């Protein structure tokens, strides 16, 4: 490929609305062009990366026994009404009507359609297992699309859906996809980690995320450096930090804390460690009648240590909170505690509340908490002596660095990641809702067990750049770079010798199957080098009159500080060795 035949368009400065590194570099490198909020055209340079990502995915999915199909972007609402997601998904689901006033959706995912296919086509146990996948455009009407391809409204994903006869077989399909994902991300050449994760809105009870490691990642990954334990912070289990509760030493004392409404301020005032304080968070749940009217509101007091943060995902799985909760209103707090937030605690309540203590708080003694009186806190608080035992003790906090690993093999560390893949075991969530059954050996209908497996194809681009860039631009892994090699001839438009050498090398490398670009635009060396460093091509060959007179060319890897000189006759072998490695 020659640059004059391709489309190379770079910018010296990123647009003002580009916020993060990947967004800035993709815009500057001419890989994407903004069309609307969260909607981008993928320009030729960016599309080449997408096609390479898709090719790796296809090869490994096919190798794992999955079968490719293509499901529509626009789907009839009836299928989504069968599962209840037409109403449940909210404004993120784009709903449209056709000229006949029939409801449709623009798909953010395809569980309903693929389950409809399965219930029509997979009638016998002899047809199972089956795994269908497609690579398709999706749309989610994000309230605030941002960060370029990282959180756009229109994007491309690979979705796979497995159908099995029983839970054991579904587990094998899940494991096969988990292994395939490992091979896919290994081939991408990115540093990543597979972590146990919450199933979220998709549903199911087994889930792993594949996270590309990046300091700018939105997700916190909790892992143990001395074992294989890894989980998303939403799911990472927090063990009690003390084996048992200490014997009380201090008396219960109501202590003035004027104007100190945070645990940090109280600890500083009382010259106590923050770990000796307990923070109070007040939630509420509403019971409704068939007409949707609230018939009963229950108030909940959740207690976590002062230096810890509430994990709302964990809290939402507890009895009484599973159906959904909200943070209590100021009026509800005043009615139950008789005090404003900042001084709340479990002692001296005006009305009963349900008390849930984090595991760590349940093992604390002589702790500090709000006194339900403005500008006062209790010190020397002990369970059993000063207040009843909590209604429930549970893991309701986020893990922190240094916590004991749940597998007992060390302590936890935390790094940032960008979710680019997710695998779920769904069970019969969708097959039951849509009556997707097969006939077993006895002719009895049974629900199919399902799994779903997604990879954010376009998101891979942003994640790779967030992980791999420097001051000059993108540093693509070779496997997904738009081109593997760029030939930069100095004076291509002026020197017959340079032109002949460049064309000869281009043809020879192309005949060997290398994916390369010959920059024949006649740009100045500095501008030419800057363009390809910005775009991030892994290997660069520089051909000049001066070098040719010495029988040499320059070869430089994208991450190498300096170019190396080598004989013209050696450059092909050297490139083959580098690209093979």
Swiss-Prot record:
Gene giving rise to this polypeptide: proS
Sequence similarity: Belongs to the class-II aminoacyl-tRNA synthetase family. ProS type 1 subfamily.
Localisation per UniProt entry: Cytoplasm
Pfam families: HGTP_anticodon, tRNA-synt_2b, tRNA_edit
Keyword Cell division assigned: no
MF annotations from Gene Ontology: aminoacyl-tRNA deacylase activity; ATP binding; proline-tRNA ligase activity
Gene Ontology CC annotation, any one: cytosol
NCBIfam families given in the database record: PRK09194.1, proS_fam_II
Subunit structure of this chain's protein: Homodimer.
Entry annotated with the keyword Protein biosynthesis: yes
The EC number(s) this enzyme carries: 6.1.1.15
Residue spans crossing the bilayer: none
Domain notes: Consists of three domains: the N-terminal catalytic domain, the editing domain and the C-terminal anticodon-binding domain.
Entry superkingdom: Bacteria
Enzyme class, broadest EC rank: ligase
Protein name as it appears in the record: Proline--tRNA ligase
Function: Catalyzes the attachment of proline to tRNA(Pro) in a two-step reaction: proline is first activated by ATP to form Pro-AMP and then transferred to the acceptor end of tRNA(Pro). As ProRS can inadvertently accommodate and process non-cognate amino acids such as alanine and cysteine, to avoid such errors it has two additional distinct editing activities against alanine. One activity is designated as 'pretransfer' editing and involves the tRNA(Pro)-independent hydrolysis of activated Ala-AMP.
Catalytic activity: tRNA(Pro) + L-proline + ATP = L-prolyl-tRNA(Pro) + AMP + diphosphate
Gene3D superfamilies: Anticodon-binding domain, Bira Bifunctional Protein, Domain 2, YbaK/aminoacyl-tRNA synthetase-associated domain
Record-linked InterPro entries: aa-tRNA-synt_IIb, aa-tRNA-synth_II, aa-tRNA-synth_II/BPL/LPL, Anticodon-bd, Anticodon-bd_dom_sf, Pro-tRNA-ligase_IIa, Pro-tRNA-synth_IIa_bac-type, Pro-tRNA-Synthase_IIa_type1
Keyword annotations of the record: Aminoacyl-tRNA synthetase, ATP-binding, Cytoplasm, Ligase, Nucleotide-binding, Protein biosynthesis
GO biological process: prolyl-tRNA aminoacylation
């Amino acid at each position: 490929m020659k640059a004059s035949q391709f489309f190379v368009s770079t910018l010296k400065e990123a647009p003002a609305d580009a916020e993060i590194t990947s967004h800035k570099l993709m815009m500057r490198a001419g890989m994407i062009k903004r069309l609307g909020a969260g909607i981008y055209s993928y320009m030729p340079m960016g599309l080449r990366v997408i096609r390479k990502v898709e090719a790796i995915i296809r090869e490994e999915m096919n190798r794992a026994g999955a079968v490719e199909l293509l499901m529509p972007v626009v789907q009839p609402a009836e299928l989504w009404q069968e599962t209840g997601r037409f109403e449940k998904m909210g404004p993120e689901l784009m709903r449209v009507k056709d000229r006949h006033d029939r409801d449709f959706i623009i798909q953010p995912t395809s569980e309903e359609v693929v389950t409809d296919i399965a219930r029509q086509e997979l009638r016998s146990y002899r047809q199972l297992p089956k795994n269908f996948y497609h690579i398709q455009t999706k749309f989610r009407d994000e309230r605030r699309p941002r960060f370029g391809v990282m959180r756009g409204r229109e994007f491309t994903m690979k979705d796979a859906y497995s159908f099995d006869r029983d839970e054991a077989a579904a587990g094998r399909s899940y494991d096969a996809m988990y292994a395939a994902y490992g091979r896919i991300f290994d081939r991408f050449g990115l540093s990543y980690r597979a972590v146990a994760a919450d199933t979220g809105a998709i549903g199911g009870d087994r889930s792993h995320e594949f996270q590309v490691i990046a300091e700018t990642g939105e997700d916190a990954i909790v892992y143990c450096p001395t074992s294989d334990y890894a989980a998303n912070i939403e799911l990472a289990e927090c063990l009690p930090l003390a084996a048992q509760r200490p014997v009380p030493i201090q008396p219960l004392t109501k202590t003035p804390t004027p104007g100190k409404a945070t645990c940090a301020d109280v600890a500083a005032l009382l010259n106590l460690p923050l770990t000796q304080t307990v923070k109070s968070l007040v939630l509420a749940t509403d019971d409704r009648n068939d007409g949707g009217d609230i018939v009963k509101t229950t108030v909940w007091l959740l207690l976590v240590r002062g230096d810890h943060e509430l994990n709302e995902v964990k809290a939402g799985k507890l009895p009484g909170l599973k159906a959904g909760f909200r943070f209590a209103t100021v009026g509800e707090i005043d009615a139950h505690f008789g005090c404003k937030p900042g001084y709340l605690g479990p002692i001296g309540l005006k009305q009963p509340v349900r008390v849930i203590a984090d595991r760590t708080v349940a093992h604390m003694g002589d702790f500090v908490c709000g006194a339900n009186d403005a500008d006062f806190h209790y010190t020397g608080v002990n369970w059993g002596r000063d207040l009843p035992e909590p209604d429930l003790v549970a893991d309701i906090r986020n893990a922190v660095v240094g916590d004991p690993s749940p597998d007992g093999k060390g302590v936890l560390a935390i790094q940032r990641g960008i979710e680019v893949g997710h695998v779920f075991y769904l069970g019969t969530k969708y097959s039951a809702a849509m009556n997707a059954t097969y006939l077993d050996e006895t002719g009895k209908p049974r629900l199919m067990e399902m799994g779903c497996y997604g990879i954010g194809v376009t998101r891979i681009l942003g994640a790779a750049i967030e992980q791999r860039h420097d001051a000059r631009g993108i540093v693509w892994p070779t496997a997904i770079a738009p081109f593997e090699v760029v030939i930069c001839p100095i004076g291509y438009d002026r020197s017959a010798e340079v032109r002949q050498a460049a064309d000869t090398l281009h043809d020879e490398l192309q005949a060997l199957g290398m994916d390369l670009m010959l920059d024949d635009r006649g740009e100045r060396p500095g501008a030419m080098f800057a363009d390809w460093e910005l775009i991030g091509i892994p290997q660069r060959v520089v051909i000049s009159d001066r070098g040719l007179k010495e029988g040499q060319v320059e070869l430089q890897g994208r991450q190498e500080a300096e170019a190396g000189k080598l004989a013209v006759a050696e450059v092909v072998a050297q490139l083959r060795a580098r690209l093979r490695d």
